[in-house]
A protein has these predicted regions:
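Polybasic "coupling" helices that flank or enter modular domains
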Residues: 52, 70-140
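A short beta-strand-loop-beta hairpin characteristic of the jelly-roll/cupin
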Residues: 11-23
Length: 182
Protein backbone atom coordinates (compact mmCIF):
# COMPACT_ATOMS: atom_id res chain seq x y z
CA UNK A 1 0.00 0.00 0.00
CA UNK A 2 1.27 3.44 -0.83
CA UNK A 3 0.85 6.63 -2.80
CA UNK A 4 0.86 6.30 -6.58
CA UNK A 5 2.30 9.17 -8.63
CA UNK A 6 1.51 9.38 -12.33
CA UNK A 7 4.67 10.62 -14.03
CA UNK A 8 3.13 10.36 -17.51
CA UNK A 9 -0.04 8.84 -18.87
CA UNK A 10 -3.75 8.62 -18.21
CA UNK A 11 -5.62 6.50 -15.68
CA UNK A 12 -9.32 6.02 -14.95
CA UNK A 13 -10.58 5.28 -11.45
CA UNK A 14 -13.82 3.37 -11.29
CA UNK A 15 -16.08 1.50 -8.92
CA UNK A 16 -18.58 -1.24 -9.58
CA UNK A 17 -22.05 0.12 -9.04
CA UNK A 18 -25.51 -1.37 -9.32
CA UNK A 19 -25.41 -4.84 -10.91
CA UNK A 20 -21.64 -4.51 -11.40
CA UNK A 21 -21.90 -1.56 -13.83
CA UNK A 22 -18.69 0.46 -13.94
CA UNK A 23 -18.92 4.05 -12.70
CA UNK A 24 -15.93 6.22 -13.55
CA UNK A 25 -15.34 8.38 -10.51
CA UNK A 26 -12.20 10.17 -11.59
CA UNK A 27 -9.77 10.56 -14.45
CA UNK A 28 -6.10 11.11 -13.69
CA UNK A 29 -3.19 12.36 -15.79
CA UNK A 30 0.45 13.46 -15.61
CA UNK A 31 1.49 14.70 -12.14
CA UNK A 32 -1.66 13.43 -10.40
CA UNK A 33 -1.44 11.29 -7.27
CA UNK A 34 -3.67 8.37 -6.35
CA UNK A 35 -4.33 6.51 -3.13
CA UNK A 36 -3.83 9.31 -0.60
CA UNK A 37 -7.42 9.14 0.69
CA UNK A 38 -7.06 5.47 1.56
CA UNK A 39 -3.67 6.06 3.19
CA UNK A 40 -5.02 8.87 5.34
CA UNK A 41 -8.20 7.01 6.34
CA UNK A 42 -6.42 3.70 6.87
CA UNK A 43 -9.06 1.92 4.79
CA UNK A 44 -8.61 -0.19 1.69
CA UNK A 45 -8.92 1.79 -1.52
CA UNK A 46 -12.39 1.13 -2.90
CA UNK A 47 -11.76 2.07 -6.54
CA UNK A 48 -10.01 0.27 -9.36
CA UNK A 49 -7.31 2.14 -11.28
CA UNK A 50 -6.99 1.23 -14.97
CA UNK A 51 -4.34 2.65 -17.28
CA UNK A 52 -6.06 3.98 -20.41
CA UNK A 53 -2.92 5.18 -22.19
CA UNK A 54 0.74 4.23 -21.80
CA UNK A 55 1.80 5.46 -18.36
CA UNK A 56 4.78 5.65 -16.06
CA UNK A 57 3.71 5.43 -12.43
CA UNK A 58 5.83 5.35 -9.29
CA UNK A 59 4.92 4.17 -5.80
CA UNK A 60 5.80 5.98 -2.59
CA UNK A 61 5.53 3.46 0.26
CA UNK A 62 3.00 4.19 3.00
CA UNK A 63 5.70 4.69 5.67
CA UNK A 64 7.57 7.23 3.53
CA UNK A 65 4.32 9.10 2.82
CA UNK A 66 3.47 9.27 6.55
CA UNK A 67 6.97 10.52 7.33
CA UNK A 68 6.69 13.23 4.67
CA UNK A 69 3.30 14.35 6.02
CA UNK A 70 4.67 14.64 9.56
CA UNK A 71 7.67 16.74 8.56
CA UNK A 72 6.42 18.81 5.63
CA UNK A 73 3.59 21.23 6.38
CA UNK A 74 3.36 22.35 2.74
CA UNK A 75 2.73 18.77 1.62
CA UNK A 76 0.15 18.31 4.38
CA UNK A 77 -1.63 21.51 3.32
CA UNK A 78 -1.52 20.41 -0.32
CA UNK A 79 -3.08 17.04 0.52
CA UNK A 80 -5.79 18.80 2.57
CA UNK A 81 -6.56 21.01 -0.43
CA UNK A 82 -6.77 17.96 -2.71
CA UNK A 83 -9.22 16.33 -0.29
CA UNK A 84 -11.33 19.50 -0.14
CA UNK A 85 -11.32 19.80 -3.95
CA UNK A 86 -12.36 16.16 -4.33
CA UNK A 87 -15.20 16.64 -1.85
CA UNK A 88 -16.44 19.67 -3.78
CA UNK A 89 -16.23 17.75 -7.06
CA UNK A 90 -18.20 14.87 -5.51
CA UNK A 91 -20.87 17.27 -4.23
CA UNK A 92 -21.14 18.89 -7.67
CA UNK A 93 -21.42 15.49 -9.35
CA UNK A 94 -24.21 14.40 -6.99
CA UNK A 95 -26.11 17.61 -7.74
CA UNK A 96 -25.59 17.21 -11.50
CA UNK A 97 -26.76 13.61 -11.58
CA UNK A 98 -29.78 14.42 -9.44
CA UNK A 99 -30.84 17.58 -11.25
CA UNK A 100 -29.40 17.85 -14.76
CA UNK A 101 -30.77 16.05 -17.81
CA UNK A 102 -28.41 13.59 -19.51
CA UNK A 103 -27.70 15.90 -22.46
CA UNK A 104 -26.50 18.67 -20.12
CA UNK A 105 -24.33 16.19 -18.21
CA UNK A 106 -22.85 14.92 -21.49
CA UNK A 107 -22.02 18.43 -22.68
CA UNK A 108 -20.43 19.19 -19.31
CA UNK A 109 -18.43 15.93 -19.41
CA UNK A 110 -17.06 16.73 -22.87
CA UNK A 111 -16.03 20.20 -21.68
CA UNK A 112 -14.45 18.69 -18.56
CA UNK A 113 -12.42 16.28 -20.72
CA UNK A 114 -11.30 19.22 -22.88
CA UNK A 115 -10.28 21.29 -19.85
CA UNK A 116 -8.58 18.43 -18.03
CA UNK A 117 -6.72 16.73 -20.89
CA UNK A 118 -6.53 19.55 -23.40
CA UNK A 119 -6.79 19.24 -27.16
CA UNK A 120 -4.47 18.33 -30.00
CA UNK A 121 -2.81 21.42 -31.47
CA UNK A 122 -3.63 20.57 -35.05
CA UNK A 123 -7.39 19.97 -34.92
CA UNK A 124 -8.93 20.63 -31.47
CA UNK A 125 -9.52 16.90 -30.83
CA UNK A 126 -9.60 15.85 -27.19
CA UNK A 127 -6.16 14.73 -26.03
CA UNK A 128 -7.57 11.43 -24.78
CA UNK A 129 -8.84 8.32 -26.50
CA UNK A 130 -12.09 7.37 -24.79
CA UNK A 131 -14.90 4.96 -25.60
CA UNK A 132 -18.59 5.82 -25.66
CA UNK A 133 -19.02 3.35 -22.79
CA UNK A 134 -16.43 5.22 -20.69
CA UNK A 135 -18.19 8.52 -21.42
CA UNK A 136 -21.49 6.92 -20.36
CA UNK A 137 -19.81 5.78 -17.14
CA UNK A 138 -18.66 9.33 -16.45
CA UNK A 139 -22.07 10.83 -17.22
CA UNK A 140 -24.02 8.15 -15.37
CA UNK A 141 -26.19 6.85 -18.19
CA UNK A 142 -26.47 4.01 -20.69
CA UNK A 143 -23.94 3.68 -23.51
CA UNK A 144 -26.76 3.70 -26.06
CA UNK A 145 -27.95 7.06 -24.74
CA UNK A 146 -24.47 8.56 -25.12
CA UNK A 147 -24.16 7.19 -28.66
CA UNK A 148 -27.52 8.73 -29.64
CA UNK A 149 -26.83 12.09 -27.95
CA UNK A 150 -23.31 12.36 -29.39
CA UNK A 151 -24.77 11.69 -32.82
CA UNK A 152 -27.22 14.54 -32.18
CA UNK A 153 -24.35 16.84 -31.11
CA UNK A 154 -22.46 15.87 -34.27
CA UNK A 155 -25.50 16.63 -36.46
CA UNK A 156 -25.80 20.03 -34.76
CA UNK A 157 -22.14 20.75 -35.58
CA UNK A 158 -20.96 20.98 -31.96
CA UNK A 159 -18.58 18.01 -32.20
CA UNK A 160 -16.98 15.78 -34.83
CA UNK A 161 -16.44 12.07 -34.28
CA UNK A 162 -13.68 9.86 -35.64
CA UNK A 163 -13.75 6.48 -33.90
CA UNK A 164 -12.72 7.07 -30.29
CA UNK A 165 -11.49 10.58 -31.11
CA UNK A 166 -13.77 13.52 -30.36
CA UNK A 167 -13.23 16.99 -31.79
CA UNK A 168 -14.87 19.92 -30.01
CA UNK A 169 -16.11 22.26 -32.75
CA UNK A 170 -18.33 24.69 -30.81
CA UNK A 171 -17.26 25.03 -27.17
CA UNK A 172 -19.61 27.97 -26.63
CA UNK A 173 -22.61 25.93 -27.76
CA UNK A 174 -21.60 23.09 -25.40
CA UNK A 175 -21.20 25.59 -22.54
CA UNK A 176 -24.69 26.92 -23.20
CA UNK A 177 -26.11 23.40 -23.49
CA UNK A 178 -24.48 22.42 -20.18
CA UNK A 179 -25.89 25.57 -18.53
CA UNK A 180 -22.40 26.62 -17.47
CA UNK A 181 -22.73 30.29 -18.41
CA UNK A 182 -22.94 32.66 -15.46
Amino acid sequence: MGLFCINTGKVKLSQAGFEGKEQIIRLAKDSDILGYRALISGEAYSATATVIEDSKICLIPKEVFYELLQHNSKLTSGIMKLLADELKDAEDKITNIAQKPVLERLAEALLMLKEYYGVEDNDNSLNITITREEIANIVGTATETVIRLMSDLRKEGMIKLDGKRIKIVKSDALLKLANLYD
